[in-house]
């Protein structure tokens, strides 16, 4: 029996027993039962499970039988009966096949062959192609359109954050993730950015639920704002819903929304779609990918993922499930593109743990302050483990850090021995070398705990010589300048600062190029759609698909507002739908738009001059004033001649208006 090299996720047909090498270099297949009918073979080729591209030529060589095999004509019982003449019966038959195997490309009835199968097996590829075209034509004449699934991209494309996607099939819709984004530097006074929910509100009767892949802000941050407009059931893993629950309490929605806990490996039914949750590795526990089983075919959404063989918490990503889906036939793969520019593999979380061990030894006489993402529970667990090992107490700083860690401890995702965690107010009662402070601010956020420490604005923590600061995070694109400013300020105060580019104190939670190619290789999708990234990330990810042989017509690089329709025959772009961004400023949601931002920018750049004057309504003479008030324009005490000249000009204009009997307020302003 020939030992065929293949990846372990690759599967040969169920009736394959082995193969024997013969003199001319070919292989003879041993099967439980040979299927030699030409018609049957065509049908099998149409419905065969996809084969891994690396071994496809070898696989085809193995399954093609030689002349010497199967000299006997096929059994009549293995031949499909001719299609019934009744039009209704034929349509019913097609419908039955669709319900059993919705992912298959062709569903047609075949007449019984008049000749034995071996005589038909020599037909050329052109003849087979003609036969397939006839099948397609037959299908079209049935008058029934193949089921399709639509995807609406309302966020997460050409940007980092604000992930928000809708899928629709046969009148049923589901939402995948509902995240927020951080404001850019030109969004003055804006707290956060959320998706535009107009399209959701218009289709509320079709939407069956919200599916969350994990608990990061760019995937759950906008949930409260959406649920204030529409009441929908939410599905997610325990930690993800624990974080959502905290947000609902802040917004007064707790108890008004149905939260449904699911676990990896479980499935739910929403309308015509079945959704299976698949365990993946990420920088937060309880992250999942999604397999969406629809009448049109299987959609795989990876969520945020990487392949980590030694994760800090939990198990390795369930590659077996993704491979199983690939063997069933995946219509489309929607995959994380964040690290598509980075070659190789993402480093394992175990490397960070080893770095912490070395740095704790190096800073044995210093107070250690570590800034990381509040949601990175596994990273905090590693810090706590090192603190326990080296006899240090742990304190937390930052509102989000306290909230997330509280949820983590309550739900059992954090293991903190008794007596290790202390209140921030008590840190000065212990020697510096006995303290580890875990804080927010790894992205240089203006009001974060680490930023306030750097600018001596923190009420409880004062940093200086003797402090060893570790920034255990990589700057999000766009935050490099603010992070650099914080590092500079800390160093000016005498702190020793360690960050990612000089030490392995952070690893990404997103897959790099080789992992992304592996995901495409085992899922073997018909269509590929890169998501979760800026334009450069999406295009680089698409380039990886091209390098693996994917045709450009089967790859879609989208933008916010795009709509896409997919089925077994085609992928086409639909007219755009309402989408965009909504700015949140304090309690105001959507009050700030482009015009307000433009005015704020002008005020910030040019300053403000206001003229205050009281004018009599009757004859228009000046009752009091004018007073000229300036903010951000010039320093008044050093510019008194300029301000006096401004008052003189205002008086002159008002006197001219009074002489010409102009009392209209709008005219005076102009």
Where are these predicted regions, by residue range?
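Hard-cation-handling environments
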Residues: 342-472, 476-525, 529-669
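Intrinsically disordered, low-complexity RNA-associated tracts
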Residues: 21-143
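His/Asp/Glu-rich metal-coordinating catalytic cores
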Residues: 125, 129-211, 216-430, 448-462, ...
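Acidic, Ala/Val/Gly-enriched low-complexity intrinsically disordered segments
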Residues: 1-3, 14-17, 28
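Generic low-polarity alpha-helical segments
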Residues: 16, 150-151, 522
């Amino acid at each position: 029996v020939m030992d065929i090299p293949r990846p372990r996720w690759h599967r040969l047909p169920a009736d394959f027993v082995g193969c024997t090498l013969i003199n001319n270099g070919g292989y003879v297949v041993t099967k439980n039962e040979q299927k030699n009918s030409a018609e049957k073979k065509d049908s099998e080729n149409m419905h065969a499970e996809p084969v891994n591209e690396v071994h496809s030529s070898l696989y085809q060589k193995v399954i093609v039988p030689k002349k010497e095999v199967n000299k006997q004509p096929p059994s009549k019982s293995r031949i499909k009966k001719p299609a019934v003449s009744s039009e209704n019966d034929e349509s019913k038959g097609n419908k039955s096949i669709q319900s059993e195997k919705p992912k298959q490309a062709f569903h047609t009835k075949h007449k019984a062959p008049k000749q034995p199968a071996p005589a038909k097996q020599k037909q050329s590829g052109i003849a087979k192609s003609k036969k397939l075209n006839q099948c397609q034509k037959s299908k079209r004449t049935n008058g029934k359109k193949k089921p399709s699934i639509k995807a609406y991209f309302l966020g997460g494309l050409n940007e980092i954050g604000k992930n928000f996607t809708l899928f629709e099939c046969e009148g049923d819709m589901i939402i995948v993730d509902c995240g927020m984004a951080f404001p850019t530097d030109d969004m003055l006074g804006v707290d956060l950015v959320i998706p535009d929910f107009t399209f959701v509100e218009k289709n509320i009767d079709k939407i069956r639920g919200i599916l969350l892949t994990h608990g990061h802000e760019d995937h759950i941050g906008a949930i409260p704002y959406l649920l204030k407009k529409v009441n929908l059931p939410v599905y997610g893993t325990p930690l993800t819903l624990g974080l959502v629950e905290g947000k609902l309490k802040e917004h007064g929605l707790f108890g008004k929304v149905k939260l449904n806990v699911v676990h990896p490996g479980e499935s739910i039914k929403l309308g015509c779609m079945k959704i299976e949750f698949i365990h993946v590795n990420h920088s937060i526990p309880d992250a999942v990918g999604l397999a969406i089983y629809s009448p049109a075919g299987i959609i795989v959404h990876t969520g945020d993922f990487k392949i980590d063989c030694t994760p800090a918490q939990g198990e390795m990503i369930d590659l077996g499930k993704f491979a199983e889906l690939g063997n069933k036939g995946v219509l489309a793969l929607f995959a994380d593109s964040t690290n598509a520019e980075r070659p190789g593999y993402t480093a394992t979380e175990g490397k960070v743990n080893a770095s912490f061990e070395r740095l704790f030894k190096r800073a044995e006489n210093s107070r250690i302050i570590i800034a990381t993402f509040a949601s990175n529970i596994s990273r905090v667990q590693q810090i706590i483990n090192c603190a326990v090992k080296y006899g240090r107490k742990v304190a937390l700083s930052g509102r989000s850090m306290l909230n997330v860690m509280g949820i983590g401890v309550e739900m059992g995702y954090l293991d903190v021995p008794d007596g290790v965690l202390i209140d921030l107010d008590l840190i000065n009662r212990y020697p510096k070398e006995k303290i580890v402070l875990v804080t927010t601010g790894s992205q240089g956020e203006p009001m974060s705990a680490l930023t306030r420490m750097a600018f001596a604005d923190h009420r409880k923590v004062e940093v200086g010589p003797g402090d060893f600061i570790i920034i255990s995070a990589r700057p999000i694109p766009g935050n490099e300048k603010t992070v650099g400013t914080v590092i500079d300020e800390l160093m000016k105060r005498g702190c020793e600062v360690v960050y990612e580019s000089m030490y392995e104190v952070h690893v990404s939670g997103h897959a790099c190029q080789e992992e992304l190619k592996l995901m495409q290789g085992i899922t073997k999708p018909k269509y590929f759609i890169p998501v979760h990234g800026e334009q450069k990330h999406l295009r680089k990810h698409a380039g990886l698909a091209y390098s693996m042989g994917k045709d450009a017509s089967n790859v879609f690089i989208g933008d916010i507002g795009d709509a896409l329709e997919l089925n077994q025959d085609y992928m086409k772009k639909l007219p755009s739908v309402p989408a965009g961004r909504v700015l949140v400023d304090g309690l105001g949601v959507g009050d700030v738009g482009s015009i307000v931002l433009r005015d704020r920018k002008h005020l910030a750049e040019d300053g403000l001059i206001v003229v205050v004057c009281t004018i009599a309504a009757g004859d228009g003479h000046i009752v009091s004033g004018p007073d000229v008030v300036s903010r951000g324009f010039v320093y008044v005490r050093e510019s008194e001649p300029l301000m006096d000249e401004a008052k003189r000009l205002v008086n002159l204009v008002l006197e001219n208006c009074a002489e010409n009997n102009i009392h209209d307020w709008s005219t005076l302003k102009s």
